[in-house]
Amino acid sequence: MASSSLPNLVPPGPHCLRPFTPESLAAIEQRAVEEEARLQRNKQMEIEEPERKPRSDLEAGKNLPLIYGDPPPEVIGIPLEDLDPYYSDKKTFIVLNKGKAIFRFSATPALYLLSPFSIVRRVAIKVLIHALFSMFIMITILTNCVFMTMSNPPSWSKHVEYTFTGIYTFESLIKMLARGFCIDDFTFLRDPWNWLDFSVITMAYVTEFVDLGNISALRTFRVLRALKTITVIPGLKTIVGALIQSVKKLSDVMILTVFCLSVFALVGLQLFMGNLRQKCVRWPPPMNDTNTTWYGNDTWYSNDTWYGNDTWYINDTWNSQESWAGNSTFDWEAYINDEGNFYFLEGSNDALLCGNSSDAGHCPEGYECIKAGRNPNYGYTSYDTFSWAFLALFRLMTQDYWENLFQLTLRAAGKTYMIFFVVIIFLGSFYLINLILAVVAMAYAEQNEATLAEDQEKEEEFQQMLEKYKKHQEELEKAKAAQALESGEEADGDPTHNKDCNGSLDASGEKGPPRPSCSADSAISDAMEELEEAHQKCPPWWYKCAHKVLIWNCCAPWVKFKHIIYLIVMDPFVDLGITICIVLNTLFMAMEHYPMTEHFDNVLSVGNLVFTGIFTAEMVLKLIAMDPYEYFQQGWNIFDSFIVTLSLVELGLANVQGLSVLRSFRLLRVFKLAKSWPTLNMLIKIIGNSVGALGNLTLVLAIIVFIFAVVGMQLFGKSYKECVCKIASDCNLPRWHMNDFFHSFLIVFRILCGEWIETMWDCMEVAGQAMCLTVFLMVMVIGNLVVLNLFLALLLSSFSADSLAASDEDGEMNNLQIAIGRIKWGIGFAKTFLLGLLRGKILSPKEIILSLGEPGGAGENAEESTPEDEKKEPPPEDKELKDNHILNHVGLTDGPRSSIELDHLNFINNPYLTIQVPIASEESDLEMPTEEETDAFSEPEDIKKPLQPLYDGNSSVCSTADYKPPEEDPEEQAEENPEGEQPEECFTEACVKRCPCLYVDISQGRGKMWWTLRRACFKIVEHNWFETFIVFMILLSSGALAFEDIYIEQRRVIRTILEYADKVFTYIFILEMLLKWVAYGFKVYFTNAWCWLDFLIVDVSIISLVANWLGYSELGPIKSLRTLRALRPLRALSRFEGMRVVVNALLGAIPSIMNVLLVCLIFWLIFSIMGVNLFAGKFYYCVNTTTSERFDISVVNNKSESESLMYTGQVRWMNVKVNYDNVGLGYLSLLQVATFKGWMDIMYAAVDSREKEEQPHYEVNLYMYLYFVIFIIFGSFFTLNLFIGVIIDNFNQQKKKFGGKDIFMTEEQKKYYNAMKKLGSKKPQKPIPRPQNKIQGMVYDFVTKQVFDISIMILICLNMVTMMVETDDQSQLKVDILYNINMVFIIIFTGECVLKMFALRHYYFTIGWNIFDFVVVILSIVGLALSDLIQKYFVSPTLFRVIRLARIGRVLRLIRGAKGIRTLLFALMMSLPALFNIGLLLFLVMFIYSIFGMSNFAYVKKESGIDDMFNFETFGNSIICLFEITTSAGWDGLLNPILNSGPPDCDPTLENPGTNVRGDCGNPSIGICFFCSYIIISFLIVVNMYIAIILENFNVATEESSEPLSEDDFEMFYETWEKFDPDATQFIDYSRLSDFVDTLQEPLKIAKPNKIKLITLDLPMVPGDKIHCLDILFALTKEVLGDSGEMDALKQTMEEKFMAANPSKVSYEPITTTLKRKQEEVCAIKIQRAYRRHLLQRSVKQASYMYRHSQDGNDDGAPEKEGLLANTMNKMYGHEKEGDGVQSQGEEEKASTEDAGPTVEPEPTSSSDTALTPSPPPLPPSSSPPQGQTVRPGVKESLV
């Protein structure tokens, strides 16, 4: 019966939990001995067995699996035998606590004293596993943390400290007593988390009893106690696991990053060394106080021969005192280092930098550019040494305040160096930082998959058990019934089976220890009951009580009333009304602003009361209609009631001061929109989902932030207090310091936001460089890069496009759509009725209903009333499902919903019954309904027409792609248009119907001429040259726009040329447009989006041309129209394939990007309104206009006091430019906070704000920081990352749509395919032949050794180090030493180059790396030679620097060695084409915006971010500014001056010399639109596409590198092959095969002894016992990847490919295989043996016969019979020796393989043989005869 099979799967019950006794211990020891013996046996017999693993669901720390039921109370807290079969022969036991958690202990004596049975240890274990114990420890840790945050702890805190130490010591003692110290598994120190405890406690005692000097540094170690929380909270360990995993995975990326940064830092060091110290120094110096005229002498210093000369200030004669006309007191050093002589810009701490090249920054009059003083930012920003350069580049890579570094460098070195920054931002910043993201995301995804798989497995196991159990139960029932029938009495009790408690066999296949029986039935039934109960959250009496109290059905009239209310409240129109109210309410809240009139304020407050009333009424009515019991079952209703209650509370407390924040809760009503707005709903869900997973992560983040905040406070707090004067001129603590916990926390949070460098400078200034760098970079790397990226990875994983595309749940209509459907139906009804009236016949309602369909049903406009999401095309994978779901609605599929169910009501509630299912995703037509469907739903005309897509990559008339008419299938078109050169019709059919005059007969007369003309035009337009010409014109006209800068007025010639050119371009484009109209016809031209774009841009040109003729060119509107010419470059879009691809991808993503954008705006709206509530009108301050200092509140307290001072003239009551005075400005402020640019000023203003119209006071409102912290977490981290999510998702979807190449392969096949793809493209290279010459040969051997390569690598590293040692201002000695070292390196590398060329001869240049080396060597030598020339003759030092960079090329050779780095670079290489396209698009956007910026902001006042170098005056400057903002850096600074709209901020009447433009004011509205749109386009879209591509390719690259066989393995195979096949014949001898496969490296290697293995590979052989390389590689690949039946077809295709690539293989056909060969050998040996035996027997017989013959020779008495026999005997054994010899030799020839004798023709083969082997080609005389021909059919099968 079933009982035999059941033991494996019967779930174990609580009876399996047996106490651990000395007998159990003895049994374990016994099993251990047996296991050891078994392993020994297996080892001797060479039996491999799978490795046993512990069961994952029985790990320590997890809960006892459900299957075991509830453990009885008596087994709780006592040692039990281990349940896991893995530990059956290991000395362990488990203990369960009340929460059913498993604790595993070692059964050896703890601390050598306490056995598992000793009373002390048992007590310790009981304490350790108790829930209260961990609770107590947790509380202790938290209390301890609170004490740690005190910046000035009271005196008694010392004793508290001792208490904590005591508690921790006690905890560790308990653990050691229970577990043992460190010898066995599961002891105290075997758990890494306990190392933490141990070190913390040790440190506590050490610091107490040993005086170690700097205590504060050691005290900081106590902070690690906070990490202990991780051990106590269960979910945290997994997240920390994921973090640690991702850090391991990051190693490659980290190495690559450090390497790249080092290379970049070296480049920076060589290029900009010492540049940042060039300052504007007052020149010439004043001789004495009276003689001031001397340095006011104009002619002297503006003398051009001095100014701008690179080297004059180094000239010693000037520095010597004698040259100063006898004034020997002048001290040059002191003069140039005195800050008083430097030129400072207003409000800046650092002197103005300058440079000596023409495009660098220049000094104002009276100043010269001299290298003096220290570097900017306390001297910490520089490229003077390698370390500072590295820091600068790391900062650049993390994009922190990099605009400052960018501006300083460009000012000092010149604008051309922008290229350096472009490379680093794109390669370093975007690429490397996103690689880190990619790695973290992958690590997280892998971890997730693993857990999911594990759960799945358990689930399946459990299901199987249930199945078995059910069967078992049935069988038992049957047995019982049978028994009852037989015996006639009741069978009592369950029969109990004896079975293994584990319900599973040991992994080794042997049963585990025998255990007492346990009943399967009870176990499962218990488990089932438990599951049932788990689903019910509360005890049963609770439900009874709830039913009584919360369901109101008292009397019949009430129930009736309730029903009526229900019908009203649940009506779709009510929902619509409520939604409209929500929107209106939001509008009302958003209309608050400052300053607001009394009346407006009253209107708003009344409005608020009305809305509160409406929402309260809705809630009350719903409560009545649904009963509280039902009402509170729905999440939305709970949400509503919460908000309504809050609104009412807020009304009650309206006048209480400080509770205005409660008003912000009304904003949550906005979220009610989510009910009817799927995207918002989905987004809230995504955030909800990720908050679950993020809960733990946030905790980890909080712990990290806490730890670092405390560390910072402990380490640096005092220093900030003591050395504050170094960083603050007024010696007050700055806003960012670490003197108390809150400020320390803010600094750490700021670092997490990616802003670390500025606070780090302060810290380094007060507390020393080493400590600050360490702490800050740790926070940066751990917090920002790893944790925040994990955050993003989680978001991405809980995000998926499917949810975006079709999130309308179950396709249920929401009430809004029903309501709107009804309204549309009503309008249709009225329309039909009125039309009827107009036609003079009155239609009855029935007729109208017949024509329209039911209300809300398939009405006229039903198509439009479909919800947005339904129109959107579902992603391919959901397609089937989606189609079904739409058809289900209509009742057209036999889905779960039968058509009958779709009764009349469903029709009414379903306004989108007519949706037709889209066919394939690529087709734009809607599917045509079949006839029955058309009859069923009256289908309006306009829906039946296929929709023409807006953008269509293929059919762009205005692009080079061939034009295909949109309406027809290509096949039809081909039939109608044989040459494909027929123009389409000009007008649509509808036009021709309306105006018959448009119809032209093209068969005769003028019509025919017209047709000929159109065909001619068509030919012209379709010609390639025409297209090329137009592209050229577009580029030229775009280029012309770049010249129209502020200097155009002064350059008359250029201006005139441009004016004429502009006209020419306009005429050309008009001509092009007319040609296309004639050629394509209006219909085609105007149905193409790209053509519309051309049309509009040409229109702009025409209008400005006409205005010029009429003389209106100076009119305002015309001028602003002219700025639209900036859009010209857009026409290039459709003409460049690469850009068009990107644009199409982007356009595809626009719907979902817009969706997310809208949702973000809603999300931000809440924060914006909250900001207006909190800060409107509070940012104003009173300022002294001369010193621009803010008055203290003791002087000026509010606006009126300020105004009373104003008449003195020097006082102004002004506002911060970016503020919260209304919702619009609130949005701008939030954008600045979210991009972390300009957020400081906003935060400072918020923190200082008091009340409306009051003077702010320093940090009076400190906790307003939290508003920003919360916004940054939700508004910035979440919402901005959602953009990345959407874009990446869309990207993947589109890839699925278009690139589904490998969708039709199984996973196995994909692996093979990829391996083969690499394989087929390679063929063995002919190795470079060893030279014949003896000396050359020796050199060759030396050069090709691996040791040689390695030593060169080491030298390259050393060279890198010597380059790093260089510094600015190094001593002459150091310069000489470095020069000599460099010389040595150049000699060595030149030597290497020469040696290689000598040894490899002309083959040297066949290897890419060698060419690279050669170029580097040449450049190094040239650089060395030129450096002397440069010092002698003044060539620009820039050239000199660039030449020195050549040396860095040598470092790049290191990449050859590292495999992991190669993968990453491979990913970069793979993404390059796509990135190039995106770069082009980005440049296009920048180009258009810079033209626009030049025409709008060229004359803006120079302040904050706009100055003499960074402005919109010329095209170059604009591009530089826009490049900066592409990463959103510094856009606040550029926006600030543009926000000046009038005096006193700027002067609208100011004259700008050289032009007739007046004023230096900006245009705030245009400025804000300009910057916000640019940031959204470039930063959010383009940059995120960059990220998406990198993630994508990184995944591909890692997949390739993680595949069992990579490129490298094949490379290695061919490298080894070259040694065995020096002539590249592609064949090797069978005899050498064994050595060959042994020489390979893993995974292809087959180590010796490998003869048998090779035979089983069954390799094909050709005459001469040779084997082809590809066959070997195929076989080895198969060996590594495992065999799969699908291989053969694939192999076939691969072979064909290889044949095509390598013609040499075509010539051979294999005639046998190694396996066959072996079989033949075996046969041959057998035949030989048999034949030898036969010969032996014969010779024995012969001998005996001869002997007898000789005996009986004379005897003639032999009978006749004997004579006959003798004859035969003679024949056989007689004197025919020779013949026998020949015969035997022939036979042996045929069979044997060892002796190769004379060739013999093979015998004819039987048919089965022919099937096995192809017919052989004629054999060359040298080769041995073909084998395998003589083997009888069936031999192969019989022999192995």
From Swiss-Prot:
Q: Which residues cross the membrane?
A: 132-150, 158-178, 193-210, 217-233, 253-272, 418-438, 573-591, 603-622, 637-656, 659-676, 693-711, 773-791, 1026-1043, 1057-1075, 1090-1108, 1117-1135, 1153-1172, 1263-1284, 1348-1365, 1377-1395, 1408-1425, 1439-1455, 1475-1492, 1568-1590
Keyword Methyltransferase in the entry? The reply is no
Activity regulation (UniProt): Potently inhibited by tetrodotoxin and saxitoxin. Inhibited by the conotoxin GVIIJ.
Q: Mind telling me which GO cellular component terms the entry cites? A: axon; plasma membrane; voltage-gated sodium channel complex
Q: Where is the IQ domain?
A: 1720-1749
The I repeats extend over: 113-448
Q: Which family does it belong to?
A: Belongs to the sodium channel (TC 1.A.1.10) family. Nav1.4/SCN4A subfamily.
Descriptive protein name: Sodium channel protein type 4 subunit alpha
Lineage here is: Eukaryota, Metazoa, Chordata, Craniata, Vertebrata
